[in-house]
C-alpha cells in the first residue's frame, strides 16, 4: 500500500534527470517498428500489433517489412533509404491485409534515432470530418492572413489561439509562454464557454521539467489522442543490436511520462495537442490544445499545425521586435551620448558619472555603481559603499565572464535582503579583472495568479521503498504576493549594457595603445637626451679644464703686471669654470642613474653613511656641524648610489643651516615592508608649497649668491630612490629645519 511522504528537493530533482526518451512504451493507437537495415528486418515491434495487424509479435519478429506489406510498397521505400532521402518518405501511405479481404491504411513515418536505428511509426490513416486532404493547408494560410492584419501583440496572441482552435476543433487552446524563471504564463486562450478560464494563470517550472522541454524542441508537434489509453511496450524491451532501450526522442508515438498523463487527467483533459514555439534553439512557449474527450488528429492536420506554428512564431518575433524598436532607439541614443562623452572626457569614468541620467537610462535602472581601479562611484539609488564592496567581492568569486543579471538578487545573495528597496535586481558587466559596472533596480511587489499552489505542485508517495511523484489535483486559482523581486531585465537592456562594455574596452585599448606609443617616444627621447648629456659632459670637461689651467697660468706668470681688477676678473673666471665643472659632474651623475641599473648587493648602511661623512669631512669641520647617527640595518641596495643620497642630504643640511651651527641626525626604522631612513637638520626649513618643486631638476628656491649649487642634488636623490622601488619625501616648515625620509623595500 502506498503511503504519502514528505516531498524533498531530492525527489523533485528526479524530474530533471528523467530518461523519458528511452521509455520503451508507446501510445496504443499506432505501431512502432524498429528495423534492421538494409533488408528492413523487424528487430522490435510494439505489442499491440496483434490487435491492429492480427499478427503476434513472435510471428513478426525476424520478418522483413516487405513480408508484412506488399513488396511493391516497400521497394520504393528501400530505394529512397539507400539514396539517403529519408525525409521524402514522410508520410508514406501503406496498406496491410489484416483479415480476409480487409485492409488497414497507415500513415508511415520513418526516422533514424541517435543509435542509427531505423524506426518506422505507423498510424491508421484518418480523414477529417469536414475538410479534404489539401484543405488543412488552405485553412492554415487563411489563419495566417488574418494574423497579418493584427496591429499589436495582444490581438496577435488572441487570433493565434482562435485560429488554432478553429483548425483543430479542440475544446480549449492556450498560448503558453515561459518567463525568465522558466515558469509558464497563459497569455492567450480560446475555449468553450462552459469551461473555467486559465488565462493569466502561472504554472511552475516543474509542470514541464527540463527533459520534457528538450523533447518539445525535438518534436515541434506532440499529440496524445487518448490520455486514458494504456501504453504499449516494445517487444523485446531491449534492442538486440545495441543491448539497450531504444531512443525514442524523435518518435511521434512515444508514450507520455505517467506524471504528465496524471497531470492531464487531473485537469479533466481527454486528449492534447502541443505545438512548440522555438526561438534561437530555446523553447519560448507552447500552443497547448486540450479536449475533454479522446480526439483523433489526422497526420495532415498535425503537419499543417506544425507549419502554422513555425510561421506564427516568426511573426511573433517580428512583432516583438517592432514593439521594442522605439525602446531600442531610446537606449541606443543613451549609448551614443555616453560614448561621445567618454571619448572627450579625461577618462571614461568621468564621462559616465557626469551624465547619470544617460547611464541609468541605458538599462532602465534607478541606480548604478562604477568600480574601476581604486575608484568606486555610486550613482542614483544604490546600496551604501560598504555593501557594494561586499557585492563586488561576491561577483568576483562567481567569476562572471560577460554579464550577470537577476531580478531576485536575494535568492542567490542573501545579504541583498538588507537593501531590497534599492537593489532587488542587479545587472553586472565585468570590464576587466576587479573592475565592474553595476546597475540596480528596486523591489516591486507583484501579485501572481497560479494554477494551483506552486509550493505543492507534486505529492510524493512511497511503496516498497520506492518514491513516486504525483502532480497536484487542484488547479484552482492560488494568489501569491511576490516579494524581493524587481522588474525583469529585458533582452534589449542587457544588450545595451554589453554594447557599453564593448565601447569601454575598445576605448581603454585605444588609450593604452596611445600611451604605449607615447611611452616609446618618450623612451626614445630620454635615451637620446641621456646620450647627449653623457657625451656633452665628457666633451665639455676637456676645454673647461684648459680654460681653467690657462687662466690660472696667466695669473701666475703675469701676476705682477696685473692690477687688482684684473686679478678679480681672473678669480671670477676660475670660479665660473669650477661651477661649470660641478654642474657637468652633476649632469653626468644624473644621466648615469638612468642609464646604469642599480647594482643591488647586501649593503651595510652604517658603512655607507661613514663613507659619505668621510667625503664631507672638510665641510663638516669648517661648519662645525654636529652629526648624530643612529643604528643602521643592512639592506639590498647599490652602495655607491645609496652613498650619493646620504651625501647629498647631509651636505644640504650643512649648506642650508643659516646662521645656526648645523646639527644633523641620521637614523633608520623598520616600517611594514620597507626600511625608512631619515636625515634631519636644524636649518632654514622649506615652505610646504615647494615640497614637490625641490625634487625637479634645476629647480632652486634661492639664488646662487645666497647658496651655491646646481639645483640637481635632490633630483638625483629622487631618481636613485625610485630606481630602488622606494619613495622620498620630507617634513618641514620655514625656520624649523627639515627631515628628509626615503624608503627602501625589504627584499628589494
Swiss-Prot record:
Database matches in InterPro entries: GAF, GAF-like_dom_sf, HATPase_C_sf, His_kinase_dom, HisK_dim/P_dom, HisK_dim/P_sf, PAS, PAS-like_dom_sf
GO molecular function: ATP binding; identical protein binding; phosphorelay sensor kinase activity; protein histidine kinase activity; red or far-red light photoreceptor activity
Other facts: The R form exhibits both ATP-dependent autophosphorylation and phosphotransfer to Rcp1 activities. Unlike the higher plants where Pfr is thought to be the active form.
GO biological process: detection of visible light; protein autophosphorylation; red, far-red light phototransduction; regulation of DNA-templated transcription; response to red or far red light
Known role: Regulatory photoreceptor which exists in two forms that are reversibly interconvertible by light: the R form that absorbs maximally in the red region of the spectrum and the FR form that absorbs maximally in the far-red region. Also has a slight blue shift for the far-red maximum. Forms a two-component system with the Rrcp1 response regulator.
Residues carrying Phosphohistidine: 538
Gene assigned in the entry: cph1
Domain annotation GAF: ranges: 152-320
Chain intervals for the UniProt region annotation (Chromophore binding domain): 87-510
Binding site for a tetrapyrrole: 259
Catalytic activity as recorded in UniProt: ATP + protein L-histidine = ADP + protein N-phospho-L-histidine
Database matches in SUPFAM superfamilies: ATPase domain of HSP90 chaperone/DNA topoisomerase II/histidine kinase, GAF domain-like, Homodimeric domain of signal transducing histidine kinase, PYP-like sensor domain (PAS domain)
EC number per UniProt: 2.7.13.3
Stated name of the protein: Phytochrome-like protein Cph1
PROSITE patterns: HIS_KIN, PHYTOCHROME_2
Record PTM: Contains one covalently linked tetrapyrrole chromophore.
Family: In the N-terminal section; belongs to the phytochrome family.
Species of the source: Synechocystis sp. (strain ATCC 27184 / PCC 6803 / Kazusa)
Residue span(s) of domain Histidine kinase: 535-748
Source organism, top-level taxon: Bacteria
Effect of residue 538 to K: No autophosphorylation; no phosphotransfer to Rcp1
Domain PAS: 19-86
Quaternary organization: Homodimer.
PANTHER family tied to this protein: PAC DOMAIN-CONTAINING PROTEIN (PTHR43304:SF1), PHYTOCHROME-LIKE PROTEIN CPH1 (PTHR43304)
